[in-house]
Amino acid sequence: MKIDILTLFPEMFAPLEHSIVGKAKEKGLLDIHYHNFRDYAEKARHVDDEPYGGGQGMLLRAQPIFDTIEQIEAKKPRIILLDPAGKPFTQAYAEELALEEELIFICGHYEGYDERIKTLVTDEISLGDFVLTGGELAAMTMVDATVRLIPQVLGKESSHQDDSFSSGLLEYPQYTRPYDYRGMTVPDVLMSGHHERIRLWRLEESLKKTYLRRPDLLEHYNFSEEERKLLDKIKEALDQGED
């Protein structure tokens, strides 16, 4: 995969080189470049200007963004504009991006963008219902979430398949050694070696956690008959005041 990031602060992306992104580069699975679009600004390196019609703040000018993208060697890139008004970023969207060969991220600053910049983009994406100073942190988050899904990047191909959201449910609780830590013990079922009982326990715990913390995820979840019965059991236990 090839990723190009347009930003006024390329140095902010240094931590990515020490994460899963750096490992993907070492394996030859990722080629990533950072472009300071101030270098392409014609007007005394000014990348922003006052909005027509008045108003507070400054807007990113179209020219530096257009010229930066036009010099990037890409055939059919997915061009993503980081915008608080965009569609929410999700695990499903990260999985979709992981199938692409070329991605371009545009990180904004100031009050917003000249609307004409949006004629370049294929996607307008938001990290959530809040506003950041710039798009860099959002871009780093999206790149990390996407790159780890590229085949062969993680040590085991199944490593991400049980992650929260990958299955549509939140992930079940997990434990490691020691068995007893300060009086807190590992659930006996996980020590049993009984694979089917462990599978059912994990599924029930995932359903319970999702029901309690993110019930919105269940609204469009495609339940199996087994999952539906387990959820009914969970609801009944909660109604009776059981853990």
From Swiss-Prot:
Q: Which GO terms describe its biological process?
A: tRNA N1-guanine methylation
Pfam families recorded for this chain? tRNA_m1G_MT
The signal peptide annotation in the UniProt record is none
The reactions it catalyses are: guanosine(37) in tRNA + S-adenosyl-L-methionine = N(1)-methylguanosine(37) in tRNA + S-adenosyl-L-homocysteine + H(+)
GO CC, sorted alphabetically, is: cytosol
- Locations listed in the record: Cytoplasm
The protein here is known as tRNA (guanine-N(1)-)-methyltransferase
What organism, scientifically named, is this protein from? Answer: Streptococcus pyogenes serotype M1
Q: Which gene encodes it?
A: trmD
